[in-house]
Curated annotation (Swiss-Prot):
Gene3D superfamilies: Severin
One GO CC annotation: cytoplasm
One family name in Pfam for this protein: Cofilin_ADF
Gene Ontology MF terms in the entry: actin filament binding
Role summary: Actin-depolymerizing protein. Severs actin filaments (F-actin) and binds to actin monomers.
Recorded family membership: Belongs to the actin-binding proteins ADF family.
Recorded superkingdom: Eukaryota
Keywords for the protein's UniProt record, in alphabetical order: Actin-binding
Keyword Repressor: no
Membrane is among the record's keywords: no
Protein name per Swiss-Prot or TrEMBL: Actin-depolymerizing factor 1
Segments forming domain ADF-H: 5-139
Protein encoded by which gene: ADF1
Biological process terms in GO annotation: actin filament depolymerization
Amino acid sequence: MSNSASGMAVCDECKLKFLELKAKRSFRFIVFKINEKVQQVVVDRLGQPGESYDDFTACLPADECRYAVFDFDFVTDENCQKSKIFFISWAPDTSRVRSKMLYASSKDRFKRELDGIQVELQATDPSEMSMDIVKSRAL
């Protein structure tokens, strides 16, 4: 069933894995990709709870678009332990124009399927999603 401006469907596994990340903290991050053959957003990679932000950024392809969610743990200025779920739209400059357009037109609808996103980041190169930027957006 397609449900976005681009006619893109969202695989049920995407929603189920996101719920596991949110409710059970079963994963540190999830990377999603659009399978153009079947016109559907699917799970590309699951990050285990012990994996770091560096592990997450290392698994994003240098020349292909992806969506991702990352469960970011941090300590506030008041010394409180918190976490926020980031939605990251990764569209590197070196990716195909058609791919960038497809990801851009499907993003809002896909994001609505993932109830509980707290912060959104868009990045075209690694510097736009550095740890400093993530920390500043979380606080």
